From Swiss-Prot:
GO MF: peptidase activity; serine-type endopeptidase activity
Keyword Signal attached: yes
Family in the record: Belongs to the peptidase S1 family. Kallikrein subfamily.
Chain residues in the propeptide: 19-24
Gene responsible for this protein: Klk7
Tissue localization of expression: Kidney and submandibular gland. Not expressed in liver, pancreas, spleen, parotid, testis, cortex, prostate, ovary and pituitary.
Annotated glycosylation sites: 108
One GO cellular component, as annotated: cornified envelope
Residue stretches making up the Peptidase S1 domain: 25-258
Free-text function comment from the UniProt entry: Glandular kallikreins cleave Met-Lys and Arg-Ser bonds in kininogen to release Lys-bradykinin. Predominant kallikrein protein in the kidney.
EC number(s) given by UniProt: 3.4.21.35
Species for this entry: Rattus norvegicus
Protein name: Glandular kallikrein-7, submandibular/renal
Length: 261
């Protein structure tokens, strides 16, 4: 099912029960502090919603299915509950979901054979640019196609358990591999298109899942994907996860940024 919305209440330090279909890091480890300075924590009002990626001091990219009526972002966070020296809070002035994304598929909370969840991408324009520091940095968009077999790293604050919701305070990283799309085509009844990347471990045990939606997938150190959807429970054998393939969207991203300075 879709990696939908995880709500974490910072004021109470509690996590609400998560609906089925969310995304989490499984089989990962605590990221080294400030090792992912482009990682964004996206909030709906005061509740944690999704991950995101800082691609420009004024722009964050995330998944289109991370929809809300109110966006706020935290930058430079490693632990979501601690006061941290590099942490920066920003409001979002505008959101730009990809025009070809089909939001009604997400709202239905169902998955049907042949459903096409392509174009799961959204740009967020910050009301004030981020301050670039040792703990907050932008990451470049890809300029070349990723290679099958590449070593990839995904990160997020999603659940570390595939069925029992257990959400970490600290940012988690997981090392996985980029697979051919044919592996995901065999795994899913939904469409797997050339606008998507297939990544994970066929033996299972390592995956992104609830709460990781919208976060980064770096392959050979290059930002190549945005966490989108996958199996439930996550990290199942022969069921890698799906990521939005950024190289297919660089022209659209640059156009939106240029037209909305």
């Amino acid at each position: 099912m879709w990696f939908l919305i995880l709500f974490l209440d910072l004021s109470l330090g509690q996590i609400d029960a998560a609906p089925p279909g969310q995304s989490r890091v499984i089989g990962g480890y605590k990221c080294e502090k400030n090792s992912q300075p482009w990682q964004v924590a996206l909030y709906s009002f005061t509740k944690y919603l999704c991950g995101g990626v800082l691609i420009d001091p004024s722009w964050v990219i995330t998944a289109a299915h991370c929809s809300s009526n109110n966006y706020q972002v935290w930058l430079g966070r490693n632990n979501l509950l601690e006061d941290e020296p590099f942490a920066q809070h920003r409001l979002v002035s505008q959101s730009f979901p990809h025009p070809d994304y089909k939001p009604f598929l997400m709202r239905n909370h169902t998955r049907k054979p042949g459903d096409d969840h392509s174009n799961d991408l959204m740009l967020l324009h910050l009301s004030q640019p981020a301050d670039i520091t040792d703990g907050v940095k932008v990451i470049d968009l890809p300029t070349e196609e990723p290679k099958v077999g590449s070593t990839c790293l995904a990160s997020g604050w999603g659940s570390t358990k595939p069925l029992i919701w257990e959400f970490p305070d600290d940012l988690q990283c997981v090392n996985i591999h980029l697979l051919s799309n044919e592996k995901c085509i065999k795994a899913y009844k939904e469409k797997v298109t050339d606008l998507m990347l297939c990544a994970g471990e066929l033996e299972g045990g390592k995956d992104t899942c609830t709460g990781d939606s919208g976060g980064p997938l770096l392959c050979d150190g290059v930002l190549q994907g945005i966490t989108s959807w996958g199996s439930v429970p996550c990290a199942k054998t022969n069921m890698p996860a799906i990521y939005t393939k950024l190289i297919k969207f660089t022209s659209w991203i640059k156009e939106v940024m240029k037209e909305n300075p």
